[in-house]
Amino acid sequence: MARRSGLLEVADQMGIPIINWSTSVKVTPKPHYSMRSYKIAKEVIDADVVINVPKFKSHKQMQLTVAIKNLFGCVPGKLKSRLHLWCGKNRRTFGKMLVEYAELVGPQLTIVDGILAMEGPGSGSSYPLGILTGGTDVVALDRVHCEIVGLPAEEFDIIQAAREIGFGVADLNQIEILGHGLCDVSVSNFEFPPMIPVNFSPFRIVTSALKHLWVKQIA
């Protein structure tokens, strides 16, 4: 995927290795967490600093994928598919699990690429949002991006889950915003996709595994 997207060439020029997560580490959860054990890629756990660089996109299961959802990528292998199954059709349960993983990873910095965002159904369409945002609080960043595209926070399960467990700052009035104000960058025509369940069917898991093998063969 890195080769096909052009990232591999840029990374090689800059001397940056692209790593496939191969080993996971069990992380002890906090008492109020949903599960008894969490697995995160060993490379993430061993890193001195974690910088989270999500692309700002609409999402057909969670409405938006920004800072918190992107950190689900720190879960190695096909464990992500099993976690989808574990959550069933409960979007709030899935949102809470995403928040818990985000808290465990604890990135020191998040930079959200919203220069050319993605909106709409299916594979999505490009949307020239024209913003680049950054911060140290992934909840605050998700909350601000909800405001930018007009998604009420009470309808975004990730923000509600963060509020429930007391992680991050979800109150817009308590978030310090530097640079352009929200009124300067907010839009009213961002298209959200039709929602689908968060659980994966066994058929989808099998087809995903086959697609993963195919991508590895042509990479």
Predicted regions and their residues:
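N-terminal and secondary-structure boundary signal
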Residues: 1-219
